[in-house]
Amino acid sequence: WASQVSENRPVCKAIIQGKQFEGLVDTEADVSIIALNQWPKNWPKQKAVTGLVGIGTASEVYQSTEILHCLGPDNQESTVQPMITSIPLNLWGQDLLQQWGAEITMPAPLYSPTSQKIMTKMGYIPGKGLGKNEDGIKVPVEAKINQKREGIGYPF
């Protein structure tokens, strides 16, 4: 799973105890939180001993009474004992993100700064495809070495 930073927030799916949930990747959250309206009624929960900080004031805060089996977005095995409260969407916190091996990377630019300036002046928009409708390739074509020494430039 990968997500480019954009105006859209990074969400991914996880399967907890066989049920699929979609949640926001939240590197600031220590624990994962499931929205109360998505928590299955037959799954046990208890009033949380500690409150939640950073999501405003939540009057009802619960925690799963059990440690639950979870599959991450790329089927990474993990366990979670999530908090449950009235929030608009689920949050995947560091308790799961660490088990999934999540990392934030900033790849090196594919092109030199000079070539990026030239392309921008020509109308290229980063992240969009090349071409009139911006639907062309988004990454450079990878050169392949001709090991057989056949074809253009080599005698037959």
Curated annotation (Swiss-Prot):
The protein's role, per its UniProt record: Retroviral proteases have roles in the processing of the primary translation products and the maturation of the viral particle. Endogenous Pro proteins may have kept, lost or modified their original function during evolution.
Enzyme class, broadest EC rank: hydrolase
GO MF term set: aspartic-type endopeptidase activity; nucleic acid binding
Residues in Peptidase A2 domain copies: 21-96
SUPFAM superfamilies assigned: Acid proteases (SSF50630)
EC number: 3.4.23.50
Assembly and interaction partners: Active as a homodimer.
UniProt entry keywords in alphabetical sequence: Aspartyl protease, ERV, Hydrolase, Protease, Transposable element
SMART domains found in the cross-reference section: G_patch
InterPro entries tied to this protein: G_patch_dom, HERV-K_Pro_peptidase_A2, Peptidase_A2_cat, Peptidase_aspartic_dom_sf, Retropepsin-like_cat_dom, Retropepsins
GO biological process: proteolysis; viral translational frameshifting
Taxonomic superkingdom: Eukaryota
Protein name: Endogenous retrovirus group K member 104 Pro protein
PTM entry text: Autoproteolytically processed at the N-terminus. Expected C-terminal autoprocessing not detected. The sequence shown is that of the processed Pro protein.
Active site residues per record: D26
Pfam families (alphabetical): G-patch, RVP
Family to which this protein belongs: Belongs to the peptidase A2 family. HERV class-II K(HML-2) subfamily.
